[in-house]
Amino acid sequence: MREGQTINIRGGRILDETTDAQGRLADVHISGGVIAEVVEAELKLPKADFDLDATGCIVSPGFVDLHVHLREPGREESETIETGSRAAALGGFTAVVAMPNTEPSQDSRIVVEFVRSQGVRAGLCEVVPSGCITVGRAGQALAPYSELRDAGVTLFTDDGNGVQDPLLMRRALEYARDLNITLAQHCEVSSLTAGAVMHEGSCCSHLGLPGWPALAEELMVHRVHSFPTRRSSDHRKSVV
């Protein structure tokens, strides 16, 4: 959209924080890339350079996906930042958070800045790189949080690798509190799920297959939310 151009979106069903799940029929006037007016469908909009018929479509703010796997760098045979961004944009997502399970992992400033720059180059949606909780997502040593935060990272996760060491996770929570960053822990005690192929229960017992107990998740959630800290329990605000 060029600077100063106007667009009218007519006949769509508005779905946002002001509506219920059914939305409401309304028309939208956009000027210079900014929503200037939303009016009921039967009312007139100002004239515009372009008119879009959105009959039968949903018109909403852009969606944000907090967990995507763009695979770049290192696993481009599965996905790239450009192809993942294109898929996101086609689905109505204007921002995505890229998980750090790349090769190398997003545990250094240079990798984080590469991911962000590739997102800008693609120019299809905002690509927000996350950082690792631990170096290489290996659960052995904490990633350099201050360095990554200075590079613009605010969300840290080891993606599908839960941090198994309680002391290491406690240290991570303390840093998260002090640096005002957010941790996303994969809630799984891996020693309880080794070899599991389905939920634990009567079905897996009948089939003779190893089950995945709910306790594996419950224990990790309880552990994270029970950690004492030296100052307060504010660390709980730092975990999602």
Model-based region annotation:
Residues 1-46:
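N-terminal metal-binding scaffold of metallo-dependent hydrolase/deaminase domains
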Residues 12, 33, 56, 67, ...:
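Divalent metal-coordination and catalytic microenvironments
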Residues 42-59:
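Active-site metal-binding motif and surrounding structural segment of the metallo-beta-lactamase
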Residues 54-119:
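Metal-associated gating/positioning segment near the N- to mid-region
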Residues 106-113, 163-175:
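Active-site-adjacent beta->alpha loops and helix N-cap segments on the catalytic face
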Residues 109-126, 175-185:
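Alpha-helix-loop-beta-strand connector modules within alpha/beta enzyme cores
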Residues 128-172:
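Active-site gating/metal-coordination segments in enzymes
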Residues 227-232:
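Short, small-residue-biased leader/transition segments that mark boundaries at the very start
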